[in-house]
Amino acid sequence: MTTMTNSLISNSVSSVPESLFSSASIHRPVAINPAMLAQFSINLPVLPFESSASLGTSTTSSSRCSSTESSAAPGKIRRGRPQQEIADGQDAHSQKKRHRRLYARQYRAQMRQKVENVKSLHDEKEQLELEVKALRQAVSGLQQENAQKDFLISILQLNNQINHS
């Protein structure tokens, strides 16, 4: 057991540079590579792509494909600005400016809509807070009324018990 441990330690120490051992007064942690201590080789079978389809996965349009296939896909999702064709008499820079103006208008419209939504939501929140306050006052009033009725009922029951005894 000790010879095996010593050989494992010597193998792992042999992978450590000698410069770490030259300064004996400084104790540094030594990195041990676990792959050097015990090497495992696991051979996993490689399944062809079609065999996974027979296991129950679908091979419809949601199946994975390589980047060359996805770039040629007809229903490809495009991101970013829509690219318009440049006519012969048009300048590419003027088209870019047109795109920027278009998206700036859309962005400003979206921001205006968000601001309007925030204002309406703020007003609605204030209205709901007022309703909650009114409902809480109504609940406290009903609780007081209920407590008064309970008090009267308990007094009447006590009077009734006193009269019967």
UniProtKB/Swiss-Prot annotation:
Disulfide bonds: none
Recorded coiled-coil stretches: 104-150
Effect of disrupting the coding gene: RNAi-mediated knockdown reduces the lifespan extension phenotype of the mir-60 loss of function mutant.
Annotated Gene Ontology cellular component terms: nucleus
Major localization listed first in the record, in broad terms: nucleus
Molecular function terms, GO-annotated: core promoter sequence-specific DNA binding
Induction comment: Negatively regulated by the microRNA mir-60. Induced in response to thermal stress in conditions where severe cold temperatures are followed by warmer temperatures.
Domain of life according to the entry: Eukaryota
Localization per Swiss-Prot or TrEMBL: Nucleus
Keywords assigned: Activator, Coiled coil, DNA-binding, Nucleus, Transcription, Transcription regulation
GO terms (BP aspect): innate immune response; regulation of gene expression
Ranges of compositional bias, category Low complexity: 53-71
Entry keyword Transcription regulation: yes
Region span, Disordered: 53-99
Role of this protein: Transcription factor that regulates the expression of genes in response to changes in temperature. In particular, binds to the promoter region of genes such as asp-17 in response to severe cold to warm temperature transitions to promote gene expression. Promotes stress-induced death, particularly in older animals, following cold shock followed by warming and this may have evolved as a form of kin survival under thermal stress conditions, favoring the survival of younger animals.
The protein's name: Transcription factor zip-10
Source organism of this protein record: Caenorhabditis elegans
Gene that encodes the chain: zip-10
